[in-house]
Amino acid sequence: MDRPAPSHSPARPARSHSPARPAPSSYRSAAVRLVRFMRFVRLPGLTVLWRAALAALLLCGIGLLPWLSRTDPALTVLKARSAEREPTAEALGVVRDQLGLDAGPVTLLGQWLGGLARGDAGESWISGAPVLPSVVQALGISLLLMAGAMAVALVTAGAVCARPLWLGSRRRFRRPRAGGAAAMLAALPEFLTASVLATVVGVQLGWLPALGWYGPRWMVLPALSLGLPAGALLGRLLADALPGAFGEPWALAAAARGLTGRRIARQALRRCFPGLLPNLGLFVVGLTGGSVAVEQIFDIPGLGRLTLQAATAQDLPVLQAGTLALVLLAAVAGGLARGVAQLMLGPVLRDGALQSSHRPSPPAHRAQPLVYGLLLLGVVVSGLIRDPLGLDTAARLQSPSWAHPFGTDALGRDVLARVGHGALTTLALALAVTAVALLAGVLLGLVPRVSGAAVDTVNAVPPVLAGLLVAGIAGSGPYTPALAVAAVAWAPLAAHASALLEQERATTHLVVTRALGAGPLYVLRYELLPAVVPPVARHALLRLPGVALALAALGFLGLGAQPPSPEWGLLLSENLPYAERAPWAVLAPAAVLALLGALAVSAAGGVRGRRAVRRGSVRRGRARAQRPEPSTVPAGRPETEAREPAKAGSSAGSSNSAPKDSR
């Protein structure tokens, strides 16, 4: 007998005649390579090695700082030890022999690392005292001050978020307010707040001590100076995330079930906290090592002040030990923040059960940014028509008048003219640095395994040290402050983007989109970026006044513009000693900075995500595909017979032209 024919699988339905799919573009292949790289760097061992490599690179850069600065380290150390001593060749030779500078930076760094492995951080080049006890003592003081400042920041953030919490818990959604008061508070420089509190509360009223560090009463004013601006910024970030949390389905179901508004508000805070915890960890490190100005004003022997003095005097053992302590603190704080965030979210990150909290929101008020912008423009234009360098010693520290609306400074120069002319360079550089930081933060935030260690390491570097490192590599010039600030300004934005990206990847709609066949480029372009970029852009605008102030503040170290340049930071520093006699000379540039902060926050309200744009384009594409195409009817053929193939073709075309998420 003949063998039976083998059974065959059912015949596949005939494919519709659709055009061939185009070859993958360069953008698609780049997205695929990015996804593969992101999967590769998820290995924990590579993350640890990457973090160790960054810390070693930072310590090596600090070890090369005296040689990068193109100055003789022996001369700097000699001046720091005794300013009156003549820098003769014999004196410089003695210093080189004592410190072993002739051996070179590589040998010195190896000796310091070898001693560190034995628990010996070396001796100070200036005082000769052991480094480790002084660094540990300064770190303890800074941690205590940071704890008080964080308590003030949390209370301030709660006050800023009180209105959104109250409205959201009662289902009263309105257009978002600009939050100008919080923005003005966040835009105030810390050293100005510290000077005002020390002068008014500490000296004039005598309520609290203004100098020293001897007990809890001495901690109140410094904690207020550091905590108020940080709390205002943290509160604005939290208030920006609350409307999306209250609009999720669980909040609607809880309200329909009859849960109290207090419980709904508490769960909304729990939903928003994981996205802000990485930035909270950055605040911890920044308040510990970056509070140099506040520690100088209140005479606090903290780690920031110790690091600044060591960087200025090029005391390498103290500088390296202080920086290493900040790097370790940043690693611990960053790890705890990410661990607590994952603990608060629970298994939803693995199950993909989150709901996207970044949705289209009602448009913000347009009148407020217009008013703030016109006021700032009026101040700048009024100052540009005046002379910022004209000296009049007979008109020193005059109060505001018709001739001088903002008064005069200690040299008789018009304050309004200096504010207006300083706005040209300060605002232009601040906008450029903020744009670069936003771009770098978003791009690095897409690879959290790489950017996480870099964020912790960069955030541990005080701005002063970053300025000195950049000046040593690129040299001192008008754009050196911009390079230094841009080198560290991307870190909080990258941390924010990474936290949002982690939550967005665990959302239900993204899991469904991938299951329906969406590729990495489609997911990145139409799902991830629209959810991450708008809140990070608003965060960048919130930091715009701080960037402007940081640019001007680095001019004090000789790294940028020098007097008589009308930089806003220079205006504050020059007039700060006369704040008690002529407060208008300090309040004028501070008020302009606060106005810039209010303008940035009110303008940030218009940066809203539009997730529905893609769906609208899909609907328009389907409508175009379903329209009957004009066809030529052959002679002698009825028109009704020609319509049927057109309808069938249009329906097939609509099914083929739909994107992958609608199959």
Model-derived features: positions:
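Membrane-cytosol interface at the C-terminal ends of specific transmembrane alpha-helices
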Residues: 215-255, 476-526, 539-544
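Transmembrane-helix boundary motif in ABC transporter permease subunits
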Residues: 125-129, 145-183, 195, 199, ...
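Transmembrane alpha-helix signature in integral membrane proteins
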Residues: 48-56, 132-163, 224, 269, ...
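C-terminal transmembrane helix and the adjacent membrane-cytosol boundary/short C-terminal tail
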Residues: 320-361, 485-488, 499, 542, ...
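An internal, D/E-rich "acidic patch" concept
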Residues: 101-154, 158, 409-410
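Hydrophobic alpha-helical transmembrane segments of polytopic membrane proteins
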Residues: 149-155, 222-233, 304-340, 568-604
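Generic hydrophobic transmembrane alpha-helix motif, especially the helices
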Residues: 176-232, 405, 454-495, 499-503
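Transmembrane alpha-helices
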Residues: 52-61, 262-294, 427-436, 521-553, ...
